[in-house]
Swiss-Prot record:
Source organism per UniProt: Mycobacterium leprae (strain TN)
Role: The UvrABC repair system catalyzes the recognition and processing of DNA lesions. UvrA is an ATPase and a DNA-binding protein. A damage recognition complex composed of 2 UvrA and 2 UvrB subunits scans DNA for abnormalities. When the presence of a lesion has been verified by UvrB, the UvrA molecules dissociate.
Protein name: UvrABC system protein A
Similarity field: Belongs to the ABC transporter superfamily. UvrA family.
Gene Ontology BP terms: nucleotide-excision repair; SOS response
Recorded superkingdom: Bacteria
Binding site for ATP: 32-39, 652-659
PANTHER family for this protein: UVRABC SYSTEM PROTEIN A (PTHR43152:SF3)
Amino acid sequence: MADRLIVKGAREHNLRSVDLDLPRDSLIVFTGLSGSGKSSLAFDTIFAEGQRRYVESLSAYARQFLGQMDKPDVDFIEGLSPAVSIDQKSTNRNPRSTVGTITEVYDYLRLLYARAGTPHCPICGEQISRQTPQQIVDQVLVLPEGTRFLVLAPVVRTRKGEFADLFDKLNAQGYSRVRVDDVVYPLSDPPKLKKQEKHDIEVVVDRLTVKIAAKQRLTDSVETALNLADGIVVLEFPDDHDERGHPREQCFSEKLACPNGHPLAVDDLEPRSFSFNSPYGACPECVGLGIRKEIDSDLVVPDPDRTLAEGAVAPWSAGRTAEYFTRMMAGLGEKLGFDVDTPWRKLPAKARKAILEGSDHQVHVQYHNRYGRPRSYYVDFEGVLTFLQRKMEQTESEQMKERYEGFMRNIPCPVCQGTRLKPEILAVTLAAGERGAKSIAEVCELSIADCSAFLNALILGVREQAIAGQVLKEIQSRLGFLLDVGLEYLSLSRAAATLSGGEAQRIRLATQIGSGLVGVLYVLDEPSIGLHQRDNRRLIETLTRLRALGNTLIVVEHDEDTIAHADWVVDIGPGAGEHGGQIVHNGTYRELLANKDSITGAYLSGRESIATPTRRRSVDRKRELTVVGAREHNLRGIDVSFPLGVLTSVTGVSGSGKSTLVNDILAAVLANRLNGARQVPGRHTRVTGLEHLDKLVRVDQSPIGRTPRSNPATYTGVFDKIRILFAATTEAKVRGYQPGRFSFNVKGGRCEACTGDGTIKIEMNFLPDVYVPCEVCQGARYNRETLEVHYKGKAISEVLDMSIEEAAEFFEPIIGINRYLRTLVDVGLGYVRLGQPAPTLSGGEAQRVKLASELQKRSTGRTIYILDEPTTGLHFDDIRKLLNVINGLVDKDNTVIVIEHNLDVIKTSDWIVDMGPEGGAQGGTVVAEGTPEDVAAVPESYTGKFLAEVVGAGCAPARTPRRRRTVTA
């Protein structure tokens, strides 16, 4: 049927021969517990088959250049359209990619500036233009009649040389005079120039007086000068002097030229001239990157409260040379009047400058040799900054280079100030009335909302309007789509590598809407990630607009509002992993609310909920972590305190500065001080309260491994203990097997036919590569001899094939192993197989594996945990389990800080730091802080407005739209 999408017998991963009938041209939401099979059905089955069919429709020649996709394990799919996947995994890490380039807005801006921009001289700011010989003559003839002037052809501009050959050549061509460095000489007796000095040479083509009768002679002279000087002619007016007493000059050019005669290197403006990825436009200093690495004194002296003897100067505080450098600084102290036991911040400015930049004087270094005899010598004191720069240039060791780079920070290029473009390109502007004239770099620095407003206000002439009208329409269309998905706070110059997964996904979503495709199947992975509740409405409107074009949308989502606005909802479950893979509900949202078998329906209808705590943990304001003077990115020099021993949620709209504050500054400082890392923190003054902590644990949703060889058992370390246990069996001891025998990563115990993979890859040339079970080990990964060793009747491969829940029961008597496995069960991963390959784990599952790995370590009560949107990919019931784990950590007096938008997590927090009020330049401040009840009472807080609806109540049912599309079952 043309209006249906029918799936029969889907068995990918944990799917249990699923049959599904979906309406086309609809917004369909797939929901269910984490690991229930949503992504397996949406991405690995429906999208994979749609993509595969499209690729196979191409010629064999074309297919060899495209990534082939495996045929999913499904009987058949009917009514399938060409499929486009919009996920969160393909964030661009290229330093040259920006929001402007990946949305193609920058391409249109380049075209706009090339065709309608007004060029100026980058030196004096005067407008520059090109003119024909006729236009030049017409401008001269409007001068008062009788005005005397010389027609000069500048053949040399600020170049070194004697130029004797040039003078001879000009003399032979019939020219009689030449002006050299503002002095006129006859070519019959030219000056002898100094070879090592720069000179200006102009040929005197003619002497004329302004009068109509001389028009033809003037035209001939101007054309001669233009031909002689490569398109430039200079007129000197001997009777009219400037403020310095020099004769006034006027420069004309067939090319772009400064009217004040400043030398320019501007060719005809083309779109490539505005590209920082092209040599025609890129700043020559930074080759279009906009940044360069430079040693930062704040990183060299990270803790100004330390003394020099205590290691205040970080590069000189570690290793065997620390004592040598301390003695050297003591010698400098004798000369400048300070001692090494004074804290850095209390040292005189002159002393700090000398330590950093070096001293002109030799310093007297005194020490005792190994026999206790006093010794001394004199040495030049080069300064720590010079020392680091020299070492950086000299070393060939990657390890040492990495160490020195730890004291360097990316700073804007000093030539282009981070704009990436040449000065002459930055001098091309477009004017927008009261908003002023802006270069392409200045427009890209604006937020998308301000950029749209600026382009709307452009003042263009009739000619420019005719040229730029269509280009502006394309730009505004794309900017409008970015605004619709809640990205108004981003700038077009924002580096793609700094975007979160949610931001990158919404940019791709906006790009797809701009493409205007019809009849496409879009598969999206949680587009609401990283989006504040305030912006959800615009995202939903964007999705419905994409559907209205005539497309089918399948959205894997847990957000209540998105589910409530769906035309059709598929709930997959009932549990996760082996307990999931079935269709629990396939119908409308209202039918889902009434479905007694659906745990999703139970939470959405209010039958189940995550309760608001009846009492919150008390906050001790004397025990807190404080970031002072945070000013990285859009943070406005703010001071923020995080109470210790409680659960703190950092909230705020997208782009308000949450990740910058917590990840770029706080977590980086903690990692350096507590874990011995060498990260470069964002700009701030200091962080206080570190003495209350002894360890940092960061948990995000990045994969636990990139290859199938990584799995929950190897990541948590429990596999090492299992291998030791197998090596301790009687059979293993008889055979002399060590724990390494039971590893599938090294020779000895693994199957060498498949090198421990369990599968063999068969290349099929024009067809996708086929993976088949290894014929030797039948997918077990180990050789026959290793598999003959059993523990309680199970071989090592059979243990890896157990679910974690089964394994916990199997190893119950072995406390060291059971403790690891019980922790994985506690975070809701009992359904996952112990040896399940890491690439098959969802983001939520990977995060919980990491959390479990940390949980099984013994707690000191002085650990701080930082989690970045831990609810990503988690169902309501998964969130409940996660909160139980987090609260267990806090109950042991540890500190947990989460960056979060989910109201269930926020309402159960003990403390909230709400950033805002808006995103981008309008953000970067603390709007509210306190308990959830305190924040809910702050009218300026967007988070507070939504929090007020749920604080003190259970999980309220999602608001349903007033009007809904009718979908036939």
